[in-house]
Design a protein with these regions (language model features):
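Positively charged n-region of N-terminal signal peptides that target proteins for export
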Residues: 1-5
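C-terminal motif of bacterial Sec signal peptides marking the signal peptidase cleavage site
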Residues: 15-18
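Bacterial signal peptide processing site
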Residues: 20-22
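Acidic, small-residue rich beta-repeat scaffolds with periodic aromatic anchors
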Residues: 25-26, 43-44, 48-68, 170-295
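Terminal domain-start segments
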Residues: 27, 35-36, 40-106, 290-295
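Beta-propeller blade termini
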Residues: 99-108, 157-179
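Acidic/hydrophobic-patterned starts of short beta strands in beta-sheet-rich repeat architectures
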Residues: 110-120, 174-183
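Beta-propeller blade repeat segments, especially FG-GAP/WD-type strand-to-loop junctions
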Residues: 127-144, 202-204
Length: 295
């Protein structure tokens, strides 16, 4: 009997020792991986995936991960409430380029934090201007910086005849960070006989709305027959054909191995929300956010 007990204790000790060794090996492996990641983060993230579309099947986990590192702890509805309660800061009177004055909501950079876009356009030069807002980690309204040049026309984000607009988007991952590049256009009238039509992309980079200028079209009307002279070039000054101009954005981001998407926006007149109650303002903001889609 005593021998059996001793034998049993020996077996138990071997089992426990094996478990301890497994835990030790697992811990060492974990430490090794951590060291590898901390020592070569850029290399790992660059080769892990180059397209956001490659992450299909783990998208929910990825979004949750982005939320965790961005500090996006406030849910969408609470963010909308902050926009509604602070509309005196963004739904203000304007005295120029006011033929259209609208707002919409979207998660432009897919980080769980909603952006409020307030845009207005008009005037003889067809100028457009847009302000971008978000709710910061403290629950306060924050206007985002942009790379737009002061006093110059900005991209036309609204449709000139509809409250709906569709935008092509190219997404890619650089050093482990997702970038969403929205292809936008801007029509400007430089003189009674000359127009400029340019294409660029917008992306939010570290809370800055960043414009990448891509290509430009010049139209000049001269002579008794008002005949058009049209030319195209990229922003490096390289001459383009008409076909190259219209395909320029796609070719530019295809060279970066970016994935193609489409975003849909719904816009509402700012005048509709100025004198609305908080409840009605929340309803309107929620409506435009629910109409937003990204595929």
């Amino acid at each position: 009997m005593k021998k059996n007990i001793i034998f049993g204790l020996i077996i138990v000790s071997f089992v426990l020792a094996g478990c301890k060794q497994d835990v030790k090996e697992e811990k060492e492996a974990s430490t090794e991986v951590t060291k590898e990641l901390s020592g070569g983060q850029e290399e790992v993230t660059e080769t892990a995936t180059e397209k956001l579309s490659d992450m299909e099947g783990v998208w929910t986990d990825y979004v949750e991960y982005l939320d965790s590192i961005s500090g996006a702890t406030m849910d969408i509805q609470k963010q909308i409430e902050v926009f509604a309660q602070n509309r005196d800061k963004w739904a203000t009177d304007i005295d120029f380029a006011d033929e259209q004055y609208k707002f919409t909501l979207a998660d432009l950079d897919m980080d769980g934090q909603v952006e409020l876009l307030v845009s207005h356009s008009g005037g003889t030069g067809f100028f457009s201007y847009t302000s971008f807002y978000k709710v910061d980690k403290d629950g306060k309204l924050k206007e985002l910086d942009t790379t737009f040049s002061e006093y110059e026309s900005q991209p036309d984000l609204m449709d000139s005849v509809s409250d709906e607009s569709d935008v092509m988007v190219y997404s890619n991952i650089i050093n482990g960070k997702g970038y969403y590049n929205y292809i936008v256009y801007d029509l400007m009238k430089e003189s009674p006989s000359s127009y400029v039509y340019r294409v660029s992309s917008l992306a939010i980079v570290d809370d800055v709305v960043t414009e990448t200028k891509l290509a430009i079209e010049y139209e000049t009307y001269e002579g008794p027959d008002y005949e058009a002279t049209i030319s195209y070039e990229d922003y490096n000054g390289t001459e383009l054909t008409e076909e190259e101009y219209y395909a320029y954005a796609a070719a530019y981001y295809d060279a970066q191995n970016a994935a193609e998407h489409q975003a849909h926006f719904q816009w509402k007149d700012v005048s509709d929300i100025v004198n609305a109650s908080d409840e009605e303002a929340i309803r309107m903001l929620t409506e435009v956010y629910n109409a937003y889609s990204f595929n």
